[in-house]
Amino acid sequence: MAAAAQSRVVRVLSMSRSAITAIATSVCHGPPCRQLHHALMPHGKGGRSSVSGIVATVFGATGFLGRYVVNHLGRMGSQVIIPYRCDKYDIMHLRPMGDLGQLLFLEWDARDKDSIRRVVQHSNVVINLIGRDWETKNYDFEDVFVKIPQAIAQLSKEAGVEKFIHVSHLNANIKSSSRYLRNKAVGEKVVRDAFPEAIIIKPSDIFGREDRFLNSFASMHRFGPIPLGSLGWKTVKQPVYVVDVSKGIVNAVKDPDANGKSFAFVGPSRYLLFHLVKYIFAVAHRLFLPFPLPLFAYRWVARVFEISPFEPWITRDKVERMHITDMKLPHLPGLEDLGIQATPLELKAIEVLRRHRTYRWLSAEIEDVKPAKTVNI
């Protein structure tokens, strides 16, 4: 009986060793096993349903440029945190730009550091698009372009954010006659001091459907003759398309070599202000009647709009900016360095200006309009 039991044990042990050997052989020579859980891997069909690995906080997402940046981030499968101070109905247009659960809306206070810390603490990318065309009793240009960006940059650095992108202006200069541009220049410096690896974007005047550039000039037809300082013969502009700026920002997020650099985003052509406004009115099929208005008189007119209780159509500072020639910064990288071909104004102007046409010309083609004359100065 004992011998039989012993033989049975031996047979069991021998079978166990062979089974182990077979299992080991199948493991070594079989298909490789997945080592990561599927939830950790990028998945989906691509586009908004994919996972890019980017978690971006976009300050100023409710503005003109912000909607394009959020859309480009959302269409590549990024999670976007959108701080807002406005009414909830003013952010409804952003909700379809990302997949379910990919857009997170958080109320914030621009002067509360705890509020800022809360919206950046889980992000690996922070983009600052905060801007204002005119000062208010609550926020002047120093608040908007210096103090708030400085606080965001400092708290982003403390939170361990990998990428910080700050949008300034091509003509930012501490010696500028425009208070707007002087504060933009100071803002660049304080952001660079707080976050040395920050990426600073310096776009020229941006045009697009919701802009305050082409639309602002086109709306002058309501006042009859068009006032221009020195008739616009002394000012050169190089506007850039909003989609190009948005793509450039997103490409800078993905570019590992962009950290710590400043980029100048400009359009492919430079125009005298006179020729540019003339082209705007030609596309809108409006009568162009320019007349020279001295800048001091232009400022008086702007002051009247500033004291009105409504959104000012023009301000004294905007008069200054409108008549400042766009700088050439060949030492800075641009859109081409981020893989983007700048879009000519003539290809997209109709998208902006069609709504300024009368019913008679609403469906007219753009081919009957001569392109604006370009300059090389």
From Swiss-Prot:
Primary location group: mitochondrion
CDD domains in the cross-refs: NDUFA9_like_SDR_a
PTM comment text: Acetylated on lysine residues. BLOC1S1 is required for acetylation. Acetylated by CLOCK in a circadian manner.
One BP annotation, GO: circadian rhythm
Primary role: Accessory subunit of the mitochondrial membrane respiratory chain NADH dehydrogenase (Complex I), that is believed not to be involved in catalysis. Complex I functions in the transfer of electrons from NADH to the respiratory chain. The immediate electron acceptor for the enzyme is believed to be ubiquinone.
Family recorded in the similarity comment: Belongs to the complex I NDUFA9 subunit family.
UniProt name for this protein: NADH dehydrogenase [ubiquinone] 1 alpha subcomplex subunit 9, mitochondrial
Species annotation: Pan troglodytes
Gene: NDUFA9
